[in-house]
Amino acid sequence: NNQEKEAIDTIGLGENRKSLDSLSLEQDSSNIFQDSMSIVSSDTLLHIEQDTIFEEPDQAQLDSFRYLRAYHDVRVYKSDFQALCDSLVYKESDSTFYFYVDPIMWSDTSQFIADTMRLLLKEGTIDRVLLDQNALILNSEDELFFNQMKGRHIIAEFDSSEVRRMYVNGNAESLYYGLDEEDAYIGVNYTTCSNMLVYFGDNQVEGIKFYNAPESVMTPMEQADHEGLKLEGFIWDL
């Protein structure tokens, strides 16, 4: 109908575009429309659910970039990440998703929380995630023990859809579980400092650099209060 066509035209899909990329937006579990959009590569499916989806842009906006806006209880599903938030903006000009109001994002075994969040794509896969204010990243292989990184701002860099490096800027806190050569837990380390740089391999913490007067406490596994060690803002909903 006319409303469906207006929604399609508003985000600049175009009636004659043909690709294997797919975008589906739903309201109250019923399809509004499905059409092609070059947000993702041809071997992936992006699925978005929301209550409200489009807002009429001016011509200058249409001439400069294609974009998507979704409002109220937005849910995003893609092969290498999933997300929840109240509001979302996607700009094709910089291949960036902007998540607003209590966003939560998941990728593999990691969960991302912040006041606002940006996700940058490169060739259809995650390149970077930028978390602004009250940033918290949780990582767990077994959902029993959780590596945690917290700060004012966090930048997470990805390669092949896995976190490789993470910069934590401002009031940095880290809590991670050390492993021996046989991948058995040996203890939990809690550190505070101004900034930190975290390296990952195979979805595990491989190393951390702490900057500006770090203070650390290492607790053996049998003595650790694992529930009490959860950082402020901890929510696990993978």
Describe these PLM feature segments.
Residues 1-238:
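Structural signature for solvent-exposed beta-strand/loop edge elements and short helix-capping sites
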